[in-house]
Amino acid sequence: MEQVPLHCCRIEHRMDFQQSLITTVHDYSLGNLDAIDFNRELQQRPTALLIPCLMEEFKRPALSLIRDTLSKLTGLSSLVIALSAESIEDVTAAEAFFADMPFPVQVHWTNGPAVREVLSSMGSLGLDLTGPPGKGWAVWQGLGVACQQAEVIGLFDADIRTFGSGYPERMLRPLLNPSHGMAYVKAFYSRLSLETQALQGRATRLFVGPLLASLEQIFGTLPYLRYLQTFRYPLAGEFAFTRDLAMNLRIPSDWGLEMGLLSEVYRHVAPSRITQVDLGLFDHKHKSLGEKPGEGLQRMASEIFCTVLRSLMEHEGCVMSMDQLPTLEVLYRRVGEDRVRQFGLDSAINRLPYDRHGEELALHRFADLLRPSLSRLLASTIAHQLPSWSRLNSCNPSFAMDLAYAGRAGRQSPSYTPSAIRLRRPNHSPSKLQIQANSSTTSAA
């Protein structure tokens, strides 16, 4: 079969205009994007982009594409790179990589020694903020940094190979105009491989979709399940929110980040203030299925499963028991096999390659995870979630500033400890409580 380069594909006049529980912003491919107008909108409301990043991403072309595309956003307030790196030299190299951007860039060293010291300092207040390291931990730190200045925060992964100017414009614009009334934006897209044009996104297509449909047959049409099924790509790692919302979200620290965030958004925001935006064709670094249950997509699916069931407990008071598990296993396999057939037809008509045998194998691997995952969840139902920044600010109003400072200047000198950071901060004014206390002491004297 002759392959047409993916970047040459352009669907003219898409006529899917359906709406449901949450607002859907479609891509009609009319070419109506306006960079000048978008930069003007960015200047009206302080906006930051957050990119969680491993040092290895700097060796791949995707991050260069993202940087060069973002360099045209002259109206952007700031860019935060939440970087996991092994040394100061790596951080310095990352700063040099983004040196010529037309807006401030903070490379925040998420696992740097000064950052770890600041995080550990909250242990005396009963808060364990030291990990586990991963995307959720990096996103949580990055939000603490970005929320100090920005009113709108957008998040993109560092491995997007199809990144274009339309991505940030379409995802941020619903939040830039307050009259739209939106608080949260979630991306969706067509996941196709740049090399083979085959369908990607197995965790979404073969696990999350069949799982939610199966749970609906067991528990009925619950509002929370309907909410999750409304999202066309619930595992999309690209989203944006207002600062007010971001400050109040607990951030999951495991691979259930995307589903866990949807649960948090459901808790805080009415569906009328949520929108999903079509970004068109999309490709990024692919994750393997994994040889063992604790690896690759299998590990991801297990943690997603636990996150969904835990969220059902929280929002609907529904608990999946071991007695119900055989029903779920049968339903999941049947629905999943139906989806494999559907994706096969979709691929055939669009002249895309489709490995049906490989898809069936992945489906069965996912099905085998249900029983051990449920056993583990019932043994310990408490999720490891990092506390919201609103809670942290109530514990220590200077904590976010200390963390941001440690992630930037704190890496350069061992003398920068949490206490030293507070002492060295310029124009550090006393709190209202301190002023009141001093006034009371003076009056008493």
Each PLM stretch: what is its role?
Residues 2, 6-27, 102, 285, ...:
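Terminal low-complexity segments of carbohydrate-biosynthetic enzymes
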Residues 9-71:
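N-proximal low-complexity "stem/linker" segments adjacent to membrane-targeting elements
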Residues 75-87, 106-112:
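Short beta-strand/loop segment that forms part of the nucleotide-sugar
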Residues 149-161:
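Short beta-strand-to-loop acidic/aromatic patch adjacent to the donor-nucleotide binding site
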Residues 195-205, 216-238:
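A recurrent flexible, glycine/aromatic-enriched loop bordering the glycosyltransferase active site
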